[in-house]
Design a protein with these regions (language model features):
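PLP-dependent enzyme catalytic core of the Aspartate aminotransferase-like
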Residues: 340-350, 355-388
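Conserved glycine-rich beta-strand-loop-beta hairpin in the small C-terminal domain of fold type I
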Residues: 279, 295-304, 314-326, 359
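Conserved core segment of the aminotransferase class I/II
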Residues: 222, 226-297, 301, 305-306, ...
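PLP-dependent aminotransferase-like
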Residues: 91, 109-170, 183
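Active-site phosphate-binding strand-loop segment of PLP-dependent enzymes
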Residues: 145-213
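A short helix->loop->beta-strand "cap" motif at the edges of active sites that frequently abuts
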Residues: 116, 137, 195-199, 226-227
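N-terminal small-domain helix-loop-helix segment of the aminotransferase-like
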Residues: 2-4, 8-99, 106, 281-284, ...
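Helix C-cap/helix->beta junction micro-motif
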Residues: 25, 135, 195-196, 310, ...
């Protein structure tokens, strides 16, 4: 059977190779420190679990939802006002997705035609590339490098490229590189997109994880963003409900309407008990989210400071739940180093090459273990002699 040629758009599954190595070592009885996948190790709050239990008791909630509950859309609007001080969002400017990955993956199908140009960060979350290619769009990568502090630089985008571009995807705080935006940077990006009539798509999944006293916001804190932007906003990491797959697309009505039209052809909406969990999270206390950010910063300090202490010059992450580390000397590729690190130290991270061409030469660590376990992982790296 000949399968879809669309599958040829995607490269080899790097995570499968890492998992094969992990399974083989576990079969040998090796103890491993898995810092590769960005799944929080914190438990969801009890009130979220109870919301799910209560909703599941109602037989009506086991039917197709067909639409987003009006009270959930209102809760998103209220949350934007409470959390981000943005009071301009209305319910018809909000829709749900089964996680931001689902939304970004389908975005190109709703918004792009064959040959449209999409501006993507390099490196980036892989689904940015996937969603663009599935929509028939042509990606143009703007580089996130050490020299530009891993931040978007709109002045690096040529005039002819800007005039052709239909979408620009931005992720701040950034997965995988851990950079964060400033009001000045957001203003530059919004002005650029307005000038060239580009739809700005902001992935705001990590707005609650910003370190060293800085504070996360929304793209809609930036004047003019309402004219040119939409934003993905997720509950997955902030509320430790990654498996529940709860995210929202917020912003321009015409974009929301187009994405809703596509979604009605693909599924029958978010499971109603999950919508009830979303309402509970959006209207509930935020102190747990704030404490969690402090814990991620302590983990960041333990990993980055610990690695620097054993001779690996890893800069501090400024936000997200990830650390972006340069591959030590002596290794040709990030994948080669990752496999060696698993084999010699039992520590699992993700090769930077899986996030785009500019990711080569780096690896990504996820801050998904307690401080003491991170300390053990650092000691295992030291004892392995892998750093020379």
């Amino acid at each position: 059977m000949e399968f879809s040629r669309r599958l040829d758009l995607f490269g080899p599954e790097i995570f499968a190779a890492l998992n094969d190595k992990k399974v083989a070592l576990e079969a040998e009885g090796r103890h491993l420190y898995n810092l590769s996948v960005g799944t929080p190790d914190f438990a969801p709050a009890d009130y979220l679990k109870q919301a799910l239990i209560d909703a599941a008791q109602d037989n009506e909630n086991w039917k197709y939802s067909l639409r987003d509950l009006p009270e959930m859309l209102e809760a998103v609007c209220s949350y934007y006002k409470r959390r981000f001080n943005v009071d301009t969002i209305t319910p018809d400017e909000v829709m749900s997705f089964s996680g931001s990955q689902d939304g970004i993956g389908h975005l190109g199908l709703a918004l792009c035609n064959d040959g449209d140009l999409v501006l993507l960060p390099d490196p980036c979350y892989p689904v940015f590339m996937t969603g663009s290619k599935l929509g028939g769009a042509e990606p143009w990568y703007y580089k996130l490098t050490k020299e530009n502090h891993f931040l978007p630089d709109v002045t690096s985008i040529p005039e002819d490229v800007a005039r052709r571009a239909k979408l620009m995807l931005v992720s701040l705080p950034a997965n995988p590189v851990g950079s964060i935006g400033t009001p000045e940077l957001y203003a530059e990006i919004v002005d650029f997109c307005r000038k060239y009539d580009i739809l700005l798509v902001h992935d705001n999944s990590y707005s609650d994880f910003i370190f060293d006293g800085a504070h996360g916001g929304s793209i809609f804190n930036t004047p003019g963003a309402g004219e040119c932007a939409v934003e993905f906003f997720s509950l997955s990491k902030s509320f430790n409900v990654t498996g529940a797959r709860i995210s929202f697309l917020v912003g321009r009505r015409d974009v929301i309407a187009a994405c809703k039209k596509l979604r009605t052809q693909i599924d029958f909406g978010m499971f109603l008990p999950i919508q009830k969990v979303a309402i509970a999270a959006l209207t509930g206390p935020l102190d747990g989210v704030q404490r969690q950010c402090g814990e991620y910063q302590r983990r960041r300090d333990a990993l980055c400071g610990g690695l620097r202490g054993i001779g690996w010059n890893v800069p501090d992450s400024h936000g997200s739940m990830f650390v972006w580390a340069p591959v030590p000397a002596g290794y040709k590729t990030s994948m080669e180093f990752c496999l060696a690190l698993i084999d010699k130290a039992g520590v699992i991270c993700t090769p930077g090459s899986s996030f785009g061409p500019s990711g080569e030469g780096y690896v990504r660590f996820a801050l998904t273990m307690p401080v003491e376990k991170i300390g053990e992982a650092v000691q295992a790296i030291k004892n392995s002699g892998i750093l020379g």
